From Swiss-Prot:
InterPro entries registered for this protein in UniProt: DENR/SUI1_TIF (IPR050318), DENR_C (IPR046447), DENR_N (IPR048517), SUI1 (IPR001950), SUI1_dom_sf (IPR036877)
Swiss-Prot/TrEMBL GO biological process terms: formation of translation preinitiation complex; translation reinitiation
Protein name: Density-regulated protein homolog
Region Disordered: start-end pairs: 35-124
Residue ranges, compositional bias (Low complexity): 57-79
Domain SUI1: 131-204
Pfam families: DENR_N, SUI1
Biased composition (Polar residues): 45-56
Biased segments, Basic and acidic residues type: 81-119
GO MF entries: translation initiation factor activity
Similarity comment: Belongs to the DENR family.
Length: 224
């Protein structure tokens, strides 16, 4: 034996175990395609456990550091928020009327007024003009028949007075109304209440008989 051979130290033989499932060395099974099946078959490799433990320790240390930093940041931001809230004043707007609410209330009031106007206009439209016939006694034997409201149906009073004077052969004239100075009545000399209703029905068919009334003791009574 030479001096060179005697001076070289002998190295231990390394035995490599191969996995029966993935055909990789068992210490690399965890990186293979079937790591779970390899772990069941071979169990954990000693080298991998050490690496895993060290990895876990380092990850735990990093997580702890990160958590501490996060907690510190959160605490600082919370303190800043509390300081800002102290400077704020709480304002109660529940009792104040906003522009939108005011606009709504105004629109509701306007709508209510319009509805009232519509109701009044409808009532006015529904009210039909009435013709009132009143027979008054003058002296003991004389009577005067007064008719009011013919002009409301577009009848010219002067023409109607001529028709009545001719029909009843009596005096007939257009006079100012006592109850309403702005309107006029027709006065007929005599008692012609019922005959006057027949004349209106014959000569003026546009006038509904249901709107002709007799005025008796200051009360209106339908003529027909």
């Amino acid at each position: 034996m030479s001096d060179t051979e005697s001076s070289t130290p002998s190295q231990p033989i390394v035995v490599v175990e191969y996995c029966k499932i993935c055909s990789l060395p068992t210490e690399y099974c965890e990186y293979g395609p079937s790591a779970k099946q390899c772990l069941k078959e071979n169990g954990p490799h000693p080298n991998n456990n050490k690496n895993t433990a060290s990895g876990k320790d380092s990850s735990n240390t990093t997580a702890t550091t990160t958590t501490t930093d996060t907690t510190t940041t959160t605490t600082t931001s919370t303190e800043n928020t509390e300081e800002k809230l102290k400077d704020l004043k709480i304002v109660d707007d529940s009792k104040e009327v906003s522009h939108v609410d005011a606009g709504k209330s105004e629109s509701k009031e306007a709508t209510g007024e319009e509805k009232e106007k519509e109701k009044v206009s409808k009532k006015k439209k529904e009210v039909k003009p009435q013709i009132i016939i009143e027979v008054n006694q003058r002296n003991k034997r004389k009577h005067v028949t007064k008719i009011t409201g013919l002009e409301l149906y577009g009848i010219k009073l002067s023409d109607a007075a001529k028709v009545m004077a001719k029909k009843f052969s009596c005096g007939c004239s257009v006079v100012k109304s006592i109850s309403n100075p702005n309107s006029e009545d027709i006065d007929i000399q005599g008692d012609f209440g019922e005959e006057l209703v027949d004349l209106i029905e014959e000569k003026y068919p546009t006038v509904p008989l249901s709107e002709i009334y007799f005025l008796e003791d200051k009360k209106k009574v339908k003529a027909r």
